[in-house]
Amino acid sequence: MTAKEPVAGLDQPFSSDDATATPWADARQQLDKAEVYWLSTVRPDGRPHVTPLVSVWMDDSLYFVTGNSERKADNLAQNSYCIITTGCNRLSEALDLVVEGDAAMVSDHAVLKRVSERFGAKYDSPFRFKVPDFAAYGEGGKNLVYQVAPKRAFAYGRGAQYSATRYRF
């Protein structure tokens, strides 16, 4: 699948004078290799909800798994718009990423199989999922798989220079 190349722009007021925009290829690579992500959703009463989770980057999207009775699943059923972040808490050398988009539940068997394989390749147990575990496959399935294709994204670089890059898709 061909990678979507967003329009990248440096937010100069939030960047060092000599900073350059972070190339999307660098951001995409970090989205692929990160191990822990944070999902932000909105509760039905309007309060925010943030939770850590694991995710994989595949087909220009982030994919994550959640139990069908978890708070994030309930929130996404009411409002699919979400934000996924990843990065680190070091001030010296880091690249923090923010991805905004709609979380779409995945039910296509071939895609679920590929997501399962990607999780298995990236994470050790207990983050291995088999396709029959997914709720799309009946009563026994307890897990929902969501795909978030970026609508907007941001990269915040820290180190010798500080940069704030905005990506528009």
Regions found by a protein language model. Give the residues of each.
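Short, basic/aromatic recognition patches
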Residues: 10-38
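Structural motif corresponding to alpha-helix initiation and N-cap regions
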Residues: 24, 69-70
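A short beta-turn/loop motif at secondary-structure boundaries
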Residues: 45-47, 90-92, 136-140
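Short, surface-exposed beta-strand-loop junctions and turns on beta-sheet-rich folds
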Residues: 70-72, 91, 162-163
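Short beta-strand segments
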Residues: 34-68, 74-76, 82-87, 95-99
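Alpha-helix boundary recognition
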Residues: 31-32, 77-78, 120
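Charged, gly/pro-rich active-site loop segments
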Residues: 1-21, 95-169
